[in-house]
Amino acid sequence: MLARKIDVAIDTFYDNTKMALMLTGARQVGKTNAFRRLARRKFECYVEINFIETPAAKQIFLGSQNAKEILLRLSAFTDRPLLPGKTLILFDEVQKCPECVTQIKFLVDEGSYRYGLTGSLLGVELEDLQEKAQVKDQDAGASEPVGYMDIKTMYPLDFEEFAMAVGVAPNLIDHIRDCFDNTKPVDPVVHEQMMKVFRLYLIVGGLPAPVWAYVQTNNIQNVALQQLAIINLYKKDISQYDKDKKLLLDEIFDLIPSELNAKNKRFILKELDRNLKFQRFQNSFLWMKKAGVAIPVYNVEEPRIPLTLNEHRNLFKLFQNDVGLLAYQYANGIQLRILSGEVDINFGAIYENVVAQELMAQGFGQLYYFNSKKRGEVDFVIEAGDGTVLPIEVKSGKDYERHNALANILDTEEYNLNKAIILCDENVSVQEKKVYLPIYMATFIRKKQEIPGIYKLEL
């Protein structure tokens, strides 16, 4: 099994709280396996209830009034002994059983066992999960399990996790991180090797099944088979959406690669229907975001804190949730050309997609780009977490030092920008406010701590 960074956070959670933990995220990001690894590390007994594979298991919670009733019914769905203090019980795919979410508080209060939940955002069932359950079970006293359950979101493997999975030595990762932290060049030999690993990441991506297929076989065709299966799974979920909107969703999903390959990479609404207005299919884009299928990056007119006040929701780029799926959708032998590092390929869309994916995985939440007729366009602007805005430009060619728009906003005194990052194929260097980093270092860009720690008021 693939090791994931989230394992440390999960261990810390179960060591320090009695609450249940729900992992959410897109299909096939590894939520269930994260709990299976946890069970092997910390528990003697593990029980897994999957509400998709075993629909009858929903009866465990339907109409239940207390933990005793729930546990009695649960015992009918497992042949394993439940050992108090030593058992982890996973409720998998809880979007199919919203009552589980609202009633988990009874089980946590009872305290005999520990609980995990997973929910796939691919499907409308999970949206407003607590609200739906409350409507159904008002007489049973259903309510949101505040104080009884925490929620963490999983993403595909980031580049650091991928590098470890394919055998990059930990000391090399440490060297690269040290170079990032101290803004110094990576050893040239290491840099060349990491660029090869990065090009492999572009075609394999970070979804566990394709990554595991590569680790086990080193066969890109096997990787592609896994990617096709995941795309088909996504399309199956889309087909179960509102009948009036599923065709539009399907078309949006299929248009992502070509729209990203366009000159400005912005999603052009007329490609869907010249007669449609944004408001009419805004929910379709929101569904794809909440489902984890796509990453929207909204336009801001000024790079100022808070960015959300300057955003234009009807102007956006739409990236794939995983760069490997994007590369697969381009097809036409592009995998081999990427691996060989052909200089005539337009890597722009793929590079920007991988950066969007990395920023999401590192906790930046909503992403933005800057565009104005007067100053030009900058690929990403993010809130660094320390009260500043950080512009990020992504360059895939030899002209990485040409970035007029970035220079324009750095020179605009009213924006008060003291640093910008240019992600490119080259090694680390600094020119005044501009920091040039190898593209693979996007995995180390973290959001700084926003909330202060201990603060004692002196009166």
What residues fall within each predicted segment?
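Pre-Walker A adenine-sensing motif
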Residues: 1-15
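Conserved lysine of the Walker
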Residues: 31
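Hydrophobic positions on the alpha1 helix immediately C-terminal to the Walker A/P-loop
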Residues: 34, 38
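Short glycine-rich substrate-engagement loop in P-loop NTPases that contacts/grips substrate
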Residues: 53-85
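Structural recognition of the conserved hydrophobic beta-strand(s) that form the central parallel beta-sheet
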Residues: 114-120, 153
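Interdomain motor-coupling "hinge/lid" segment immediately C-terminal to the ATP-binding subdomain
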Residues: 126-262
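Accessory nucleic acid-recognition modules appended to NTPase machines
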Residues: 211-386
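Domain-level recognition of nuclease-like catalytic cores that cleave nucleotide substrates
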Residues: 426-459
